[in-house]
C-alpha cells in the first residue's frame, strides 16, 4: 500500500477506536512520519502513533473529575495518547515539541462540529510554537538528555536492541534529530514545520536501523548531546519572553469549544 494512504488509514483506525469512548475533538499523527523518518521494509517498520484531544462533559467539570490523560496501546503496539483539552493546551504552553508537532501534521481527523476553532488552532500553530522560545529550547535540550540516558538502559521494550547493538539506535537518532531541530529553530529561526524534517534524514534512518557500533554510537551521542546543550545555553535569554497573543489564542479556542459543547449538552437535557 502507498505510504500516504497507509498512514491515513491507520490514523482513521485510531479515531474509530476511541470515538465511542470519548468526545474526540482532534486526533493527529505523532512521531517519525512527521519527520520523514518512517521506514517500511523487511528490517524495520515504523508504528503509526497518534495524540487525541478530547472534551470533558459538563458533569466532569461540575464534579471536578480528574481530566483524562492516558495512553492506549493497541493490539499492534501502536499508541494513542489521549488528553483532555485542558491538559493538552497546557502542554502546548509548556512548548514540548512532541505535543506541538500535532498542530503541524498533514494527517489528522477533526470533529466537524468544531471545525472553525480547530482550523484557527492549526492556523495559529507557528505562534503557539514560539509562545516561550526559552522554554522550547530547554525542552529540546532536555529531550536530548533523556534520550542519552535511555541509550543503553535495558527497558523491556528495548532490551532486544540493547542486546543486539549494545545500545538503542532509535535513541541515538533522536539525539541527532534534536540537535538538527534546535539549530534550525533557535539559530536559523526557521518555521517550526520546517524544523520537523531533518536535513540529514537518510543518514538518520540508517542510524535508526543500527548503522554504528556501540563505541562510535556512544561517542557521537555524548558529543552531539553536549553540543545541543551548548546551543541551548548560548540562546536562552535571562528572562523568558512570553507571547501573550499565543496564550490568548489558546484560551479563546478552549473557551469557545467548551462553551459550545456545554451549551449543547444542557439544551439536550431540556
Language-model-detected regions and their locations in the chain:
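N-terminal regions immediately upstream of nucleotidyltransferase
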Residues: 1-10, 228-235
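Membrane-interacting alpha-helical segments
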Residues: 5-21, 76-77
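Active-site nucleotide-donor binding segment shared across nucleotidyl transfer reactions
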Residues: 14-65
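Generic structural signal for hydrophobic core residues of well-folded globular domains
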Residues: 54, 92, 179-186, 261
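A basic- and aromatic-enriched beta-loop-alpha substructure that forms the phosphate/nucleotide-
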Residues: 61-153
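Conserved nucleotidyltransferase catalytic core and NTase-mimicking acidic/glycine-rich helix/loop elements
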Residues: 114-252
